[in-house]
Curated annotation (Swiss-Prot):
Catalytic activity: an acyl-CoA + a 1,2-diacyl-sn-glycerol = a triacyl-sn-glycerol + CoA; di-(9Z)-octadecenoylglycerol + (9Z)-octadecenoyl-CoA = 1,2,3-tri-(9Z-octadecenoyl)-glycerol + CoA
Enzyme class: transferase
Source organism per UniProt: Mycobacterium tuberculosis (strain ATCC 25618 / H37Rv)
One Gene Ontology term from the biological process aspect of the record: biological process involved in interaction with host
Residues that span the membrane, as ranges: none
UniProt-recorded name of the protein: Probable diacyglycerol O-acyltransferase tgs3
Lineage, top ranks: Bacteria, Bacillati, Actinomycetota, Actinomycetes, Mycobacteriales
Listed GO MF terms: diacylglycerol O-acyltransferase activity; O-acyltransferase activity
Gene induction: A possible member of the dormancy regulon. Induced in response to reduced oxygen tension (hypoxia), it is not induced by nitric oxide exposure.
Length: 271
């Protein structure tokens, strides 16, 4: 089904560049099952569960001339083996070697001509462990209730639920002309929404002179701060390149729960 990206999802999609990829990475380190976990078994598991996240078989199609936000369309050339990949460390691989591998994988941008996600099965990790690393674009999983592929393949019980056989038939590509006509129709029916879609959201938010003055004041304050160069000294205050480093910080889940209860918020709000 052809659906238009929301304003926030379209923003994540458009803001991406090689130095600032807009995806979310998830690393799972697991004990290897007694029966093992082959690449073929992982492929089968992912294929079984894709119906729960149908967006993962869709790609983004931009509208010519930028008349409207991009749309999600079925990827008629969807290839599960492109998205689910296999890698290995020189056995027995250490955690440091795993972190170096993840840093290299994290530096690679997602291919915008395909569904915006990847999964890597990493073998050879010491202490009889394996790792799963997934990359999912923010446009795919934006929102608290959205599901990512890494969550869908993880079961809460030892015995996974039964999944009905999935026979997926991709829809026909809508084509450039149809998308343009649909965009023109949206302009006629909802001109305000389309203005917001092409970059006039700020004008829509400023509804009176008081808001305009306040917005201008904030912009000037930010400009003065930048001009004075008052950012604190930190290794993070540097030009961002496409290269990445991966490191680990350990924290107690009980501490997260305490903060969440104290301030009545979810963990993602303050992390």
């Amino acid at each position: 089904m052809v659906t238009r990206l929301s304003a926030s999802d379209a923003s994540f999609y458009q803001l991406e560049n090689t130095a600032t990829p807009m995806y979310v990475g998830l690393l799972l380190i697991l004990r290897r099952p007694r029966a093992g976990l082959s690449y073929e078994a992982l492929l089968e598991t992912v294929e079984q569960r894709l119906p729960q996240i149908p967006r993962y078989r869709q790609k983004v199609q931009e509208v010519k001339l930028g008349l409207a936000r991009p749309v999600w369309i079925d990827d008629r050339d969807f290839d599960i083996t492109y998205h689910v990949r296999r890698s290995a460390l020189p056995s027995p691989g250490s955690d440091e070697q795993l972190h170096e591998l993840i840093a290299r994988l994290a530096a690679r941008p997602l291919d915008k001509s395909r569904p915006l996600w990847e999964m890597y099965l990493v073998e050879g990790l010491e202490k009889n462990r394996i790792a799963l690393y997934t990359k999912s674009h923010q446009a795919l999983i934006n929102g608290v209730t959205a599901l990512a592929i890494g969550h869908v393949i993880a079961d809460r019980t030892r015995r996974p639920p039964a999944f009905p056989e999935d026979i997926w038939v991709p829809e026909r590509d809508p084509g450039t002309t149809r998308l343009l006509l649909r965009a023109v129709g949206d302009w006629l029916v909802r001109p305000g929404a389309q203005l917001q879609a092409v970059g006039s959201a700020v004008a829509g938010l400023v509804t009176n002179s008081g808001q305009l003055v306040e917005t201008g004041r904030k912009v000037l304050d930010i400009a003065r701060t930048v001009a004075r160069g008052t950012a604190p000294s930190s290794p993070l205050n540097a030009t961002v390149s496409r290269n990445r480093r991966f490191t680990v910080a350990r924290a107690s889940l009980d501490d997260y729960r305490t903060v969440r209860a104290r301030y009545d918020c979810d963990s993602t709000t303050w992390c």
